[in-house]
Amino acid sequence: MNFSVLNWNIEGSKYYTSTKLSKIIPHLEKSTADIFCLQEAQELREKILISNKLSNFNCVFPENKKDRNIILSKFPLINSGEISFPIIIHSVLEKAIWADIKINEQIVRIYNCHLEIVGVGPKQRLEQLNFIMEDAKKHLGPVIICGDMNTTIPVAGWGRKFIQLFHKVTNNNLITDQEYFHKDERHIFLKTAELSGFQDAINLHDSTWCIMPIRWEIFKLKLDWFLVRNIKKPEISLGKYVSDHRSILAKF
């Protein structure tokens, strides 16, 4: 079963790092990926319909046009849906979307996620990850969970204090487990995924986010993940910074 998936947070529209679609679309059209999982893609919906290449893909759009995750697939879509996370602090939350995709007579379940960031911390993101992995138990075949997981909390120190202040994260939302309290958030996130049988295809110490336009990888944060279960780990290629996130191409 040979196929490829491109995961990418394309826009960065929430903050000062907003990226113009005119820079993003050519990269998508040149990509050889069979499946795209895109975050912050709410402005892309109309562009897809008029793109010579992307308009030929099968699409999973959220029901609410303000929701920002999209899945595009060259392969047939068997089923799809949305996951609304339990309310944490907001009345409007990020959601995850999923699709069952038929690839060479096998059904692959793909989740495209964008986890919460403002006013929440590792505790809440782990709850959201567990919520997705619990849903994934319904599918016995290959499962992929990818997206911008916003694992933003660095090792204990001034950098962590800065991130907490910037994203309004209280100490109560941090991990209190002594083994992980002083570590970067990515370590407890990976352990939680592995306990449910998932492997991460991206190097744990890779940085996937920067401050644009200067491309400063402050704190060397790994926000983007590619978790797999019941399928071989893919080869990963990290793209250059066109948005504030690297694109991630996974070849199976």
Say what each PLM segment does.
Residues 99-102, 109, 125-155:
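His/acidic metal-ligating clusters that form di-metal
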Residues 36-40, 61, 144-148, 199-203:
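Active-site neighborhood of phospho(di)ester-bond hydrolases with catalytic His/Asp-centered motifs
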